């Protein structure tokens, strides 16, 4: 992470170029898949079935490559050594006690009690973020991973009933496993997979609404859109949602970071 030398600002790299590529491709591919998938299912008239299916199949490898190759690379390229990488993964992507405390604070703030806690924590000493994600996103991410796996597995069968990989009858294996579950719901194996595929589509729509329409509907969060899609930078002097951990006895707690920047600095007591 790099910061500039202007004492009035503290600009650091929040997202690398590969982070931005991954997020942009993921967003575009997901939107294309949702729209074309619902067109195929519902029969909307704004494009032909052939066009929708073609666009759908083009977007699939992009989504899978980003989520199963590029994003894991981005995650585990951080940290030094095996334990450092594991520590980075846990701190940044696993919902823990500190995230629970932040989430409770966010819920209280929603009901007008208390301030909105900082969910971005930057360590000035190490020059790295301790955590960047909204606590609710740390809950949604593993659920998204599961949903992506299920929609891929069901999609293989919907694409081709006898699809195979290197001679292995993958689609038939999936149908066989589905056949163990489907009778419980009074469905055929393929019918169950079709419903599962549709339900996962609705999940991704729900996640999109939560991610964009609720968590980040606050204009003060829009700075992160510019960072994730374009600049990759964050100015930590903008204290909304941000805490800077300083290696000195005057480290400001979250409540102090929410002061009006025009106010005079108050004395921080240990």
UniProtKB/Swiss-Prot annotation:
Membrane topology summary: Multi-pass membrane protein
UniProt keyword list: Cell membrane, Electron transport, Heme, Iron, Membrane, Metal-binding, Methanogenesis, Oxidoreductase, Transmembrane, Transmembrane helix, Transport
Alphabetical list of InterPro entries matching this protein: Di-haem_cyt_TM
GO biological process assignments: methanogenesis; respiratory electron transport chain
Annotated signal peptide: none
CC per GO annotation: plasma membrane
Induction: Expressed in methanol-grown cells.
GO molecular function, one term: metal ion binding
Cofactor (UniProt): heme b
EC number: 1.12.98.3
Top-level taxon: Archaea
Reactions performed catalytically: methanophenazine + H2 = dihydromethanophenazine
Subcellular location: Cell membrane
Annotated transmembrane regions: 27-47, 57-77, 139-159, 173-193, 195-215
Subunit (UniProt): Composed of a large subunit (VhtA), a small subunit (VhtG) and a cytochrome subunit (VhtC).
Similarity section: Belongs to the HupC/HyaC/HydC family.
Free-text function comment from the UniProt entry: Part of the F420 non-reducing hydrogenase II complex that catalyzes the reduction of methanophenazine to dihydromethanophenazine.
Protein name stated in the entry: F420 non-reducing hydrogenase II cytochrome subunit
Organism field: Methanosarcina mazei (strain ATCC BAA-159 / DSM 3647 / Goe1 / Go1 / JCM 11833 / OCM 88) (Methanosarcina frisia)
């Amino acid at each position: 992470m790099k910061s500039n030398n202007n004492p009035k600002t503290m600009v650091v790299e929040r997202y690398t170029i590969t982070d931005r590529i991954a997020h942009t491709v993921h967003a575009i591919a997901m939107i294309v898949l949702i729209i074309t998938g619902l067109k195929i299912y519902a029969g909307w008239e704004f494009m032909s079935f052939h066009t929708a299916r073609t666009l759908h199949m083009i977007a699939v490898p992009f989504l899978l490559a980003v989520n199963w190759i590029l994003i894991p690379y981005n995650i585990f390229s951080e940290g030094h050594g095996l334990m450092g990488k594991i520590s980075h993964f846990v701190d940044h992507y696993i919902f823990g006690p500190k995230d629970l405390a932040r989430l409770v604070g966010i819920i209280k703030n929603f009901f007008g009690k208390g301030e909105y806690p900082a969910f971005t924590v930057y360590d000035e000493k190490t020059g790295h973020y301790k955590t960047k994600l909204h606590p609710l996103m740390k809950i949604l991410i593993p659920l998204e991973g599961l949903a992506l796996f299920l929609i891929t597995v069901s999609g293989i069968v919907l694409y081709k009933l006898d699809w195979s990989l290197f001679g292995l009858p993958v689609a038939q294996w999936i149908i066989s496993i589905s056949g163990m579950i489907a009778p419980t719901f009074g469905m055929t194996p393929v019918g169950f997979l079709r419903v599962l595929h549709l339900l996962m589509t609705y999940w991704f729509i729900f996640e999109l609404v939560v991610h964009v329409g609720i968590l980040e509907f606050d204009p003060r969060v829009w700075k992160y859109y510019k960072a994730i899609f374009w600049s990759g930078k964050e100015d930590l002097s903008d204290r909304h949602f941000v805490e800077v951990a300083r290696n000195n006895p005057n480290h400001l707690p979250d409540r102090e970071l929410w002061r009006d920047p025009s106010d005079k600095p108050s004395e921080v007591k240990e």
